[in-house]
Amino acid sequence: YLNQTEPLFDVLRVTERGFSGMVADHRNILKIVEDPSLAATNIAVQYDVTAEPQIVLTLQGPDDKALTDYLSEHRESLVQVLEKAERDRAVKFAEAFSEQRVAKAIKSTFGVDMTVPKGYVLAADEKDFLWARYEYPTASQGFFIYSYPYRGKESLSPGALLAARNEFAARIPGPSDGSYMTTSEAFEPDYRMFRMEGRLWCELRGFWDVHGDFMGGPFVSHALLDKKKGRVIVAE
């Protein structure tokens, strides 16, 4: 859900002869092996073969068509395996080098344990709203967390989630006086509800704008129902 096309991965293609040294130590590797003696196409998964952390997928098939057909049929599954490996690495790195000040603020404000990557700083911390940001020389990224009362199923509807998002996003100022973040009306956000680890979640994917200025981009938010405290917690 991006405002411009971007590849899922950066791909480096090498021959078997060139697969050595630093190339063989890449963290995500997909080997394609054509072997006419094979009766069917199969795939094997290995971890930490020449480096750590690393995932190596070896796809073997009797001919070009069999390999291509397998990739086409199982594309989504293969992408999910590689994406999970990337997420696991990111989580492991964040846990090793976390930003404790922001994590403690989240725990204090919302009672939630959250690992925050190093480099984030608190931009706002209120009783029902927290905003953390990471500044680059030419760009900025960040996340915000907020909560609002749960008053029944309607509190998790797309309309309620959007209304809450716009209310709290307005607390994030834009670059010019009087400007603030809001949800773009150019495209209706995608909404889905799902359960994970026994908890009910709602997801919104859409685009944000800055009211009163020219800025925008994609966003994804996840809302969690906290029945014990009668509230909805949203992280974006």
Outline where the language-model segments fall.
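Secretory pathway targeting signatures of secreted, lumenal, and periplasmic proteins
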Residues: 1, 117-174, 209-211
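Solvent-exposed alpha-helical segments and adjacent loops
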Residues: 1, 33-100
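Acidic, contiguous N-terminal accessory segments
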Residues: 1-19
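N-terminal "mature-domain start" segment
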Residues: 3-4, 8, 94-123
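Signature of long, low-cysteine stretches enriched in small and polar/charged residues
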Residues: 14-66, 172-230
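Structured segments of extracytoplasmic/periplasmic soluble domains
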Residues: 81-85, 171, 207
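Structural recognition of the beta-strand scaffold that forms the well-ordered cores
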Residues: 114-115, 203, 233-235
